[in-house]
Amino acid sequence: QLAGIDLLDGYRISILGERDLANLAIDRMRDNPKLFGMLFEDDDANLKFIPDGWFSHNQRRLNEMHVNFSQRFVDIKARRIRPKIAVAFNKELDARTKRKLPIYDILSAMLLPSIDKVAIKIGLAQTAVDHARIACHLELHKLKHKKHPAKLTDLETPLPHDPYTGKPYVYKPDSKGRYQLYGVGWNQKDDGGKVVLSNNGGLDLDEGDLVWRFFPVTRPKGE
């Protein structure tokens, strides 16, 4: 069942829906400028004089950002998440808001999702699903051979790869029956299985690795 959970494809579907919904919103605002005024809590009668070309310009800008960035951020065929595209997306969006006349692009900017924040969470969740799936195979191997394998290839079954690198997850067993399984996470750097915490004590999803740890539980004496 875990093998059937593909959150990367879920991202693909959701971002296409996001794009369609944004295009529909612009079409509706073009037909009824009062809807545009609702975005700014402004019912100025002059809104009806906004030229169609302005809406068309923002619609083109919106679709450019989706085609060039948000729809390329997750590569379904390669099963990869590409953070560099999210960085480029943010730079382009920031550059547009700093132009001399940012009003030209304001509507498209308002209707674009924060793909980096969405994808960081998808990457975390998909990695967790992958780790749980691999952990199940590790336990099945242990039931059969009385110990965990020395390396993942000993499992002799197809396993998911780290979506941030396209390479196998890092697996580090030890002599005490413990193991560590991790992916490199958003920074795409192997930090040796290091988990980084944010200032509020939560997991820092921008830095460090995404780690699954197993520690065998020892029964108390007498049980």
Task: Cite the ranges covered by each PLM segment.
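Short acidic linear motifs
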Residues: 1-223
